[in-house]
Regions:
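Helicase motor core with emphasis on the C-terminal RecA-like subdomain
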Residues: 6, 10-15, 19-23, 27-39, ...
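Basic/polar N-terminal segments that are highly enriched at the extreme N-terminus
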Residues: 1-4
């Protein structure tokens, strides 16, 4: 085992408590530690986050992680802070922070405390943030949920397409890591082209998930009663129920609550504080079920979700 491998395995054990890597993780991390551009395509649950978290902790400087959702960023920052004595090891930089909080974030980055800085793409377009980040040592930029770049993807975000130009402004030869769980060949090509990483090493994991199975049931006029029955048969297990409309989300969550199921609603119509509260309740096992629109779910790291119900055809 080479010195890099020895360091890698001891760091994996030290920071994350794992004795071995999963799937392609080790090769991905070695490529990142060698300062190469890297493109990672892994299914949900494949361990994508660790692919940039571990090298960020090991490398000198701060890694920028571009993420589309405040909920996702908060989830990951909390997890990283949980493995370190340094509260400032990971930070979010977004519009919800007060001036005092922004000052603290910048101090921690300048002092070399912060290893992971999570930002929404909009935050990177702010001139004051660009000017600040130009002056500090950056280890790499990781673009999570990279399919948001592609107009051919299912979750296109226009602000993602400006990332390459901004990264160029932050410094020369900053390695770029693109990560996604959902990319057709056309979307993959678009991501690589848009991020200007044609020399990137591509790591693509198998998408076969033998632990998952699908079931299609007839939707009766008593669908609410059917869902209540199913959830009660799986009492105490975590689950997500997706609905097409916000109105239906709130109605169904209320019906579940009235029938003794611990459930919360979640959709983009709630303010950030409420969304964050409901997400935390689900992650911390305070409720069993989230009834949601597609605003919920991207990047949520909860290892024990046991069922997902689609109330309406997506």
């Amino acid at each position: 085992m080479s010195l890099m491998n020895t360091d890698l395995h001891s760091s994996l054990k030290k920071y994350f408590g794992f004795s071995k890597f999963k799937g392609l993780q080790e090769g991905v991390i070695q490529n990142i530690l060698s300062d190469n551009d890297t493109f990672v395509i892994m299914p949900t649950g494949g361990g994508k986050s660790l692919c940039y978290q571990l090298p960020a902790i090991m490398k000198e400087g701060t890694a920028i992680v571009v993420s589309p959702l405040i909920a996702l960023m908060k989830n990951q920052v909390d997890a990283i802070r949980g493995i370190s004595e340094q509260h400032g090891i990971a930070h979010v930089l977004n519009s919800s922070l007060t001036k005092t909080e922004v000052k603290q974030v910048k101090e921690d980055i300048t002092n070399g405390v912060t290893k992971l800085l999570y930002v929404a793409p909009e935050s990177l377009t702010k001139e004051e943030n660009v000017e600040f980040l130009k002056k500090v040592k950056l280890s790499f930029v990781a673009v999570d949920e990279a399919h948001c770049i592609s107009e051919w993807g299912h979750d296109f975000r226009p602000e993602y397409r400006n990332l390459r130009g901004i990264i160029n402004r932050l410094g020369d030869n900053i390695p770029i890591i693109g990560l996604t769980a959902t990319a057709t060949p056309k979307v993959q090509e678009d991501i690589i082209k848009n991020l200007g990483m044609t020399d990137a090493k591509v790591f693509k994991a198998s998408f076969n998930r033998p632990n998952l199975f699908y079931e299609v049931r007839p939707k009766t006029k008593d669908v609410d009663a059917d869902i209540i029955r199913f959830v009660k048969q799986n009492q105490g297990k975590s689950g997500i129920i997706y609905c097409l409309s916000r109105k239906r989300v709130e109605e169904l969550a209320q019906v579940l609550q009235v029938n003794g199921v611990s459930a919360v609603p979640y959709h983009a119509g709630f303010d950030a504080k409420t969304r964050s509260k409901y997400q935390d309740m689900f992650l911390m096992e305070e409720v069993d079920v989230v009834v949601a629109t597609i605003a919920f779910g991207m990047g949520i790291d909860k290892p024990d979700v046991r069922f997902v119900i689609h109330h309406d055809i997506p």
